[in-house]
Structures are given as structure tokens and as C-alpha cells.
């Protein structure tokens, strides 16, 4: 056992946070394959038991990205919309709809995702059904983005190192730091992000990690109803990340003219309904609660991309969602 692994596991066993140097070194060993499965399991369990801190999550992100297939040459602002998942809500795929609306409006969207976590369909499931390729390679991604304003990067294709860690995660059988890292590992390194969390206690943690991983501007959101998106069910909690500063924000749908709704208004019961619903959402013909939920998240994205107020972003979003996207799906 290397000295850094020994020091780190000893610290975690007594409930101590890892230093930046320890965290960087230990995750480098994890992703390089120098750590045994037993040591990796002890590391992940120790972090989970103690409670992960931003420095530790950020170190994991940096190490994972060093092993990832990164997209080069995107020299313009771009955005990802995603959540940690696991909120158990069985809602329609709002974040993917928001991404498609943004691209339809001319913003560059670098969508990074996987198959279903908490919904009936994950972003990959939905986009595959809409005809979007899941096989875009690292060499193709930039050109696809500049041509279509949208590129989807299917996570397993860009993070081969995770294949070595998957068996350990499966054996542990509990959420670990890797569940937090997922939304932070976009290989295109977007400048902007809408990041949803299903648990309010990790709202600030994820915002702090975005600062440490150099995202320029973002909203980290925890929606009313314990959703990992802004919802029209009540007041939503959010943190604006900008220039390394964190600002807590309450986003009340009523302030922007949205009618109150309930979680069941945005639920889908199975995969076929989820796939049919996304088409209605993109056409602007879905139930109003779903369209409002898309507009709320779209408005937040527009506000950080355009550098305008939430009110201006919401108005622009509502007008767009009312007519649907220009492309037919």
C-alpha cells in the first residue's frame, strides 16, 4: 500500500477530511488502477460515512477528466443541463427537453448523459428515440456541435476508466461520491451549467465543486417536491455560481406568472409514455404543467447565457415553449 493511500484511509477512518493534496493523489491512484478493489471500496465508504466535501469531489472530477476523452476546440460559451438523478420522481425528461429548446434557439448545448436513473427514460433513452446518435466520437463531437448547435456525449463512450470502477460500485451497493461526480464530468467542459440536485443537503456542496472545477456561470437547483429541476409546485431553492461567488436564490414560479401545479401533473408511468411526452413537450402541446416546468428551467438557462435577469429569461422561455421547437421530432 502506498503512503498516500495509507494516510488517506487513516484520515477517513477517524472522520477527517482529506486535504487537496491527499484527495488529488488518492484519486489519481484510483483512476490509474494502482489501488486494489479493497482499498477503493474503503476509500469510497470512508468518504460516504464521513460526508463528502467539495475539495474531495473536485479532486475526483479532476482525476476522472484526466482519464476521459475530452472534446477540444470549442472556443465559445456552451451549456449542459443535467441533474444528479435519483430523486425517484418518475417525471418526464425535462432537462433533455430544455437542452433541445436551447439548441433550437441557437445556443451551443453539450449534453452529457446516460440512461435512466430516476425517470422512466434517461437522456440517452429519449435522444436515441428522437434519432440523435449515441455513438458520436470524440473526433466528431466538435463538428456536430458547431453544425447542429447540439451534441450528445454518451457517458460510457467518453469515460473508459469508469469501467474499472463499476464492479466496485456495484458490490458496495450504495450511492457514493461517483453519483455526485456524474453531472460534473462533461468531456466538452461547458462554460455554463444548469445542475439539479434531488437532495437539498448537497445544494451548496455541488455549487462549491463547480467553483473548484472552473465553471464560469451556473445555477445549482433543488426543486420544490424534491425534484432535481425547477418545478411549478412551489418555491425552489437555487445557488447562482458566478465569478467564483455563490449567491443563494429563491425562485418562486408565481413571481413569473406560472400557475401552481402538482408532481403528478408532470409524471409519466412508463417508457412509452415518456417517449411520447417528450415529443409533445417539444411541439408545445404537452400539458401546461410540463410546459411550465420546461420554461422555468429554460428561463434560468437563458438568464445565465445572456447575462439577463431571471424575469427576462423566463419571459423569453415562455414565448419559445408556447410555440415549440422549429425542428420536427
UniProtKB/Swiss-Prot annotation:
It catalyses: N-(5-phospho-beta-D-ribosyl)anthranilate + diphosphate = 5-phospho-alpha-D-ribose 1-diphosphate + anthranilate. One of its GO terms (biological process) is L-tryptophan biosynthetic process. Catalyzes the transfer of the phosphoribosyl group of 5-phosphorylribose-1-pyrophosphate (PRPP) to anthranilate to yield N-(5'-phosphoribosyl)-anthranilate (PRA). 5-phospho-alpha-D-ribose 1-diphosphate binds at residues 83, 86-87, 91, 93-96, 111-119, 123. Binds 2 magnesium ions per monomer. This is Anthranilate phosphoribosyltransferase. Homodimer. Its cofactor is Mg(2+). Anthranilate 2 binds at residue 169. GO terms for molecular function: anthranilate phosphoribosyltransferase activity; magnesium ion binding. Anthranilate 1 binds at residues 83, 114. It is an enzyme of class 2 (transferase). Pathway: Amino-acid biosynthesis; L-tryptophan biosynthesis; L-tryptophan from chorismate: step 2/5. HAMAP family: TrpD. Keywords: Amino-acid biosynthesis, Aromatic amino acid biosynthesis, Glycosyltransferase, Magnesium, Metal-binding, Transferase, Tryptophan biosynthesis. Its EC number is 2.4.2.18. Pfam families: Glycos_trans_3N, Glycos_transf_3. Mg(2+) 1 binds at residues 95, 229.
Amino acid at each position: 500500500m502506498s503512503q498516500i493511500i495509507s494516510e488517506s484511509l487513516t484520515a477517513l477512518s477517524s472522520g477527517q477530511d482529506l486535504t487537496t493534496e491527499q484527495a488529488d493523489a488518492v484519486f489519481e491512484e484510483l483512476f490509474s488502477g494502482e489501488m486494489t478493489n479493497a482499498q477503493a471500496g474503503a476509500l469510497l465508504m470512508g468518504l460516504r460515512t464521513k460526508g463528502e466535501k467539495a475539495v474531495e469531489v473536485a479532486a475526483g472530477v479532476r482525476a476522472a477528466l484526466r482519464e476521459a476523452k475530452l472534446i477540444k476546440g470549442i472556443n465559445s460559451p456552451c451549456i449542459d443541463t443535467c441533474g444528479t438523478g435519483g430523486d425517484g420522481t418518475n417525471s418526464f425528461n425535462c432537462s433533455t427537453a430544455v437542452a433541445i429548446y436551447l439548441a433550437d434557439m441557437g445556443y451551443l448545448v453539450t449534453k452529457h448523459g446516460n440512461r435512466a436513473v430516476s425517470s422512466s427514460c434517461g437522456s440517452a433513452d429519449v435522444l436515441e428515440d428522437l434519432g440523435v446518435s449515441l455513438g458520436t466520437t470524440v473526433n466528431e463531437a466538435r463538428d456536430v456541435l458547431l453544425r447542429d448547435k447540439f451534441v450528445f456525449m454518451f457517458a460510457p463512450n467518453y469515460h473508459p476508466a469508469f469501467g474499472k470502477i463499476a464492479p466496485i460500485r456495484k458490490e458496495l451497493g450504495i450511492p457514493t461520491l461517483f453519483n455526485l461526480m456524474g453531472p460534473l464530468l462533461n468531456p466538452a467542459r461547458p462554460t455554463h451549467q444548469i445542475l439539479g440536485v434531488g437532495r437539498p443537503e448537497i445544494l451548496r456542496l455541488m455549487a462549491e465543486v463547480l467553483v473548484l472545477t472552473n465553471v464560469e456561470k451556473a445555477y445549482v437547483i433543488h426543486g420544490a417536491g424534491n425534484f432535481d429541476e425547477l418545478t411549478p409546485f412551489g418555491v425552489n431553492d437555487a445557488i447562482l455560481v458566478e465569478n467564483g461567488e455563490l449567491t443563494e436564490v429563491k425562485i418562486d414560479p408565481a413571481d413569473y406568472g406560472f400557475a401552481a401545479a402538482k408532481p403528478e401533473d408532470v409524471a409519466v408511468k412508463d417508457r412509452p409514455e415518456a417517449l411520447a411526452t417528450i415529443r409533445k413537450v417539444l411541439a408545445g402541446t404537452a400539458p401546461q404543467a410540463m410546459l411550465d416546468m420546461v420554461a422555468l428551467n429554460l428561463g434560468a438557462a437563458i438568464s445565465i447565457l445572456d447575462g439577463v435577469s431571471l424575469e427576462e429569461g423566463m419571459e423569453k422561455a415562455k414565448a419559445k415553449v408556447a410555440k415549440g421547437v422549429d425542428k420536427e421530432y
